[in-house]
Every structure is written in C-alpha cells, then in structure tokens.
C-alpha cells in the first residue's frame, strides 16, 4: 500500500471506518509490516520484538487487547489468533487523539470508546464487570516492577481502590451489602473529569502520538 494506492477505494473505506487520514494509514501500514515481518497478519508473538513493551508491567494485557474480539468489534468475548491490517487500524483508532473539529456529542462518543477499551483490559473474563480479583491482578502487575512494594501491599492498594470505587458508584453501603464489581457505567463515573487523552498513547509502537494528529 504505497503512495500510488493512497486514493484507492480501500483507503477511503479505512478513512471512514477509523478516522485516520490516508497519510496516517500509510504510516501505520509501514509499522504493521515491520511488526508482521512483511506478512498479511500479526500474531501475539510478533509483539515480542517491541523494545518499549519488554519492561512494561502490563505488557500481556496490552498485547491481549489487540486480539480481544470486543475491541475488534467482532463479538462479546474471545480472542483472535491473528489480526490483519484493518483490525490493527481498528485498535489503533482507540488511541487517536480527539479531533478539534468534533462536536460535543462526537467528543463524548470518542471518550466513551477509549474508556471501553480500557475497561476491557481490566475485565479479563468478558462478563461486563471488573471484580476485585481482576482489579487486584492489574494493580499487582502495575506494581510488580517496584522492588519496594510487596504483593500484600499491592493487594491492599487494590482493595482500597475497589472500596473507593464502590463508594463513588453506590454511595453509602449497608454493612452486609456486597459490591460485586465495577460495571462499565461505574467505570465511566470513576473516570469522570479525568483527561483520558494523556493516559492513552502509542509510544510502545515507536510512534509518537502527535504523528497521529491531523
């Protein structure tokens, strides 16, 4: 997919589906070919050669997100064995900065899509709810690179954060009331007022976020 094909129907369709310009699609295609070894699809093992991911404590969750059928809009659960370039673009579109030409409704929709992507990273069993155990796993992985924080401390941090989430989402709970986990609606409440744009970037693919701006 070179410059000669930049105006092709295929590229125009991808522009419409992902919001990327033809130049951005060409740039992402070059990165896709690097990752895939010039093959038509990418498998999980292709991400083993990404230096910026090697030391990332949630590397496995980031890679898994690329193959999650929910993120690929191919179903409510399950993982794909491999992804093609259009799938790759679909995932990368979650990281695309909000366009300044968007109206308020479009901005809110884009923000919700980004948060849904993050929610799926936590909700590993695809049941639509982030349980305490799932939350603990993420926190423990995030803190695993810190030699000063033991596993029990990480669990305590996760437990405290989950209690705070319950407070935000349910208000004052009865002593015998059990908080079963964070739904996506709860997740939206927790992230209300937080700048999601600064939390999602693509540096692990050796591509600066600004390169994906219009």
UniProtKB/Swiss-Prot annotation:
Residue positions binding Ca(2+): 123, 125, 127, 129, 134
Biased composition, class Basic and acidic residues, residue ranges: 7-16
Function: Functions as an integral cofactor in cell pH regulation by controlling plasma membrane-type Na(+)/H(+) exchange activity. Promotes the maturation, transport, cell surface stability and exchange activity of SLC9A1/NHE1 at the plasma membrane. Promotes the induction of hematopoietic stem cell differentiation toward megakaryocytic lineage. Essential for the coupling of ERK cascade activation with the expression of ETS family genes in megakaryocytic differentiation. Also involved in granulocytic differentiation in a ERK-dependent manner. Inhibits the phosphatase activity of calcineurin.
Phylogenetic lineage: Eukaryota, Metazoa, Chordata, Craniata, Vertebrata
Organism: Homo sapiens
Key word Iron-sulfur present: no
Induction cue: Up-regulated during granulocytic differentiation in a ERK-dependent manner (is mediated by activation of ERK) (at protein level). Up-regulated during the differentiation and maturation of primary megakaryocytes. Down-regulated during monocytic-macrophage differentiation in a ERK-dependent manner.
InterPro entries hit by this protein: CHP3, EF-hand-dom_pair, EF_Hand_1_Ca_BS, EF_hand_dom
Protein name: Calcineurin B homologous protein 3
